[in-house]
């Protein structure tokens, strides 16, 4: 089992000056950020481009703007886009939902979720769907460690997405417990997660063992994410991000 250990500092929220077309709400500064994902170069051919727009809101709640991990996870989805049509995909801790929105645009059947305790984050999920003309994408409240009627009613998933959900160490076990419950519906489901390393003292190894899970690290260079400016953005910058695939220990990838 691979150990997951952070190695880099916390990333600050985006600079307000970097947001496009800012608009004001009571106590909030909002804008739109555009990401362009391009196909690999083909000799003599055109490169298809997929555009995703997401809202950005400067707010104390973390999920209201794009973090470096989200762009890396979205790039992994884009690299594997041909495997996504028809797949059932759930994004947890979605916030502005860049990975989930991209998956939906690539043909996956996507459900976006965020904490039911933060209605503004759920509103941001819905706004992302509206901006990308995805009325079919469902948004549900899902709080770490809580078995609610929403989580009970979720259908089996093929892929669970989570970008930078391992942010507060005190939440790590609640996150894995929630993922474990979701995996019970489909033991072959995979949890695709990006993780910004922040402290050498943090590790998921013990919790993964406790919950009978295993973790594989995916090299960033294997899906063209080993750069500072993915999807024509300024992210992930110089932050150290790891791509993880977590599954039940008894199942092989």
From Swiss-Prot:
Example GO biological process: epigenetic programing of male pronucleus
GO molecular-function term, one example from the UniProt record: DNA-binding transcription factor binding
Protein family per UniProt: Belongs to the methyltransferase superfamily. METTL23 family.
Function: Histone methyltransferase that dimethylates histone H3 at 'Arg-17', forming asymmetric dimethylarginine (H3R17me2a), leading to activate transcription via chromatin remodeling. Maternal factor involved in epigenetic chromatin reprogramming of the paternal genome in the zygote: mediates H3R17me2a, promoting histone H3.3 incorporation in the male pronucleus, leading to TET3 recruitment and subsequent DNA demethylation.
EC number: 2.1.1.319
Pfam families named among the record's database cross-references: Methyltransf_16
GO cellular component, one term: male pronucleus
Intracellular or extracellular location(s): Nucleus; Cytoplasm
UniProt KW keywords: Chromatin regulator, Cytoplasm, Developmental protein, Methyltransferase, Nucleus, S-adenosyl-L-methionine, Transferase
Subunit description: Interacts with HSPA5, HSP90B1, TUBULIN, UGGT1 and UGGT2. Interacts with TET3. Interacts with STPG4.
Region (Disordered): 1-23
Phenotype of gene-disrupted mutants: Mice give birth to significantly smaller litter sizes. Moreover, about a third of the homozygous newborn mice die before weaning and only a few survive to adulthood. Strongly reduced 5-hydroxymethylcytosine (5hmC) levels in zygotes.
Domain of life: Eukaryota
Catalytic function, reaction form: L-arginyl-[protein] + 2 S-adenosyl-L-methionine = N(omega),N(omega)-dimethyl-L-arginyl-[protein] + 2 S-adenosyl-L-homocysteine + 2 H(+)
Expression tissues: Ubiquitously expressed.
UniProt main location, coarse: nucleus
Entry protein name: Histone-arginine methyltransferase METTL23
Species of origin: Mus musculus
């Amino acid at each position: 089992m691979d150990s997951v250990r952070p190695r880099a500092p916390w990333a600050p929220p985006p600079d307000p000056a970097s947001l496009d077309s800012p608009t004001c709400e009571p106590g909030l500064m909002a804008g739109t950020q555009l990401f362009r994902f391009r196909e690999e170069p083909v000799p003599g051919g055109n490169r298809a481009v997929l555009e995703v727009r997401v809202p950005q809101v400067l707010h104390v709640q973390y999920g209201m703007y794009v973090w470096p991990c989200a762009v890396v996870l979205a790039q992994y989805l884009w690299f594997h886009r041909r495997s996504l049509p028809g797949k059932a995909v759930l994004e947890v801790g979605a916030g502005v939902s860049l990975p989930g929105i991209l998956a939906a645009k690539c043909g996956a059947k996507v459900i976006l979720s965020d904490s039911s305790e933060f209605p503004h984050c759920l509103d941001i999920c819905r706004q992302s769907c509206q901006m990308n003309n995805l009325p079919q994408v469902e948004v549900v409240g899902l709080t770490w460690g809580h078995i609610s009627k929403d989580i009970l009613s979720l259908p089996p998933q093929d892929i669970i997405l989570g970008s930078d959900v391992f942010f507060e160490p005190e939440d790590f076990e609640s996150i894995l417990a929630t993922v474990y419950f979701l995996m019970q519906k489909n033991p072959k489901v995979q949890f695709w997660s990006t993780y910004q390393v922040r402290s050498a003292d943090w590790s998921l190894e013990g919790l993964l063992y406790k919950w009978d899970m295993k973790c594989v690290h995916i090299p960033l260079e294997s899906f063209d994410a080993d750069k500072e400016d993915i999807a024509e953005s300024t992210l992930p910058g110089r932050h150290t991000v790891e791509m993880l695939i977590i599954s039940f220990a008894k199942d092989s990838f």
